[in-house]
């Protein structure tokens, strides 16, 4: 085989491998999302999964996290204007909110998780920022889908 033929064969092999890699990545990225997850709205990046959750308190909407879950929350780069998230169960969007930082001077009328207020490895899903008085709309946190899911996996607290 001549050198030019070897280059053509090598180029075809490289292109095939690249194509297979791209198709594989696309396939895996479109797989249904299983379980509970808090995802960044803009990138669909999973921030917290049920593997990061120790317990979910139905009454206070507090989520006790594993040490790894706390690290993930602390690693978020949340701007003063917040970072939108969506809570999903098995890929179905349940409700939206925003990660927020308690040093922000901006108010927010939606659901928030203040990433700077982690206490005892626990985050809280709250109405409005800086207080519930700023919240507008219907409170989506009392979702039977979330409660049922955590009940089934033994992580729901009353």
Regions found by a protein language model. Name each.
Residues 2-16:
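N-terminal Sec-pathway targeting helices
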